[in-house]
Amino acid sequence: MEIAITLAYLVYSLSLSIDQARELLKFFCHLELSASQADLLLNHLAKLWKAEFDALVEMMALATVVYMDETGWKVSAKRCYAWVFTSLLHTVLLYGRKRDAAVVDEILPRDVFQGIGVSDDYAVYRNRFSKGQKCWAHLLRKAIKLMLSYPENPRYRKFFEELLTVFREGKRLQKDGRLSDTGRRRKLEELEDRFRSLCSRFRPEEEQRQAPGGEDYAALLKELVRCLADAELFTFVLHPEVEATNNVSERTFRNSAQARNTNRTSKTEAGAKRRSVISSIFTSLRQNLKELTLESILEEVTGWCRTGQSLFRRQLQELRDASKPPPDSELPAPALA
């Protein structure tokens, strides 16, 4: 188990190739593994952890807040995508998938997920959650790009500055612990009115649409107005525990981006599934363990084998128990006429 976990950590957490990981094991541990032996070890580990991965998937649908994102990922020469769904304590990574709504439905079924979905404005996320938060980092980047690409147009700079001011006011309200729920709603209404005024004042006329960058500017205004109408711009004000960006999911992708940029993506669909299982477990262990070390992982995983129940399956059972209705004996007695 120790060898398999060490090998998997080198490959999936440090983004080394299997050959590089074998070379390190040989150098530091005097352990020689053939390529086929390394492949068998990783396959065996993924098989052992499949039930834990399934528990992570089920818990994601029960989370109160989920941050999500997707990025390009090749399987052999086929263009696919990698997805990340992350909550406070758990992460599900999927590799070699399509970029469509079916992936979101698989992880966050409409009839199960009642939490807040934090995402960019990609089409599959629109009108998808009962409560949503669009990523302000993506929106601000678009405004920054306009401002820097067309410095000769002062309107773009002024628009960005006012948009940033409104966002910062929202962040200030988010952190204001003195506000009651009623106070937050009142402040939110004022902030939304201010935002509507901003969008109205900067609405492009036909002449401005024809100017350099005018189409992108008009598209950004339209996107902002739609997100406001969908009540997905300032959810973080009403729910201070929610971040205003999905940067947490983007950070989770750093190892994946490094592997992709060095052409170490998946060679087969089976390899993509193996990476999905092992990477999800490692990332979720990092979120739950005080310190992620080989010793702490081994202690946790050997405990799974000894007790027959993993940390994640135990957490899932607790969530299931918490969501069960109380038995009839614990329900309040009906009032007598």
Task: Please identify what each model-predicted range represents.
Residues M1-A337:
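Catalytic center-proximal scaffold of phosphoryl-transfer enzymes
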